């Protein structure tokens, strides 16, 4: 689950096809990310947040989790809010992760 499953490919920006359900989203722009089996994998540390080797997922209702094995922590924040990648939800996610 926490191993690169897409070889040399990288996670690209998520472009919406249903704007009333989701905004376009790109988590940690400019940083290399991979897909594992069921999660996004970080290949480098994110500023103010998780370590390289961390895994994460996001759901349509602005539900998010991450696991950082190097630091021995995990975080879960669940909202029921549309559209996905709502700017206020992303700001709350960022503040929550920085606080942990």
Model-found features: residue ranges?
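Catalytic loop of the DD-peptidase/beta-lactamase superfamily, centered on the K-T-G motif
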Residues: 1-100
């Amino acid at each position: 689950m926490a191993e690169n499953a897409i070889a040399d490919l990288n996670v690209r920006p998520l472009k919406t096809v249903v704007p009333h359900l989701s905004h376009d989203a790109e988590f940690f722009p400019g940083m290399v990310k991979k897909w594992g089996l069921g999660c996004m994998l970080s290949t480098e540390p994110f500023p103010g947040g998780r370590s390289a080797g961390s895994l994460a997922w996001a759901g349509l209702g602005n539900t998010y989790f991450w696991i950082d094995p190097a630091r021995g922590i995990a975080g879960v924040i669940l909202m029921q809010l549309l559209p996905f990648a709502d700017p206020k939800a992303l700001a709350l996610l960022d503040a929550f992760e920085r606080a942990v």
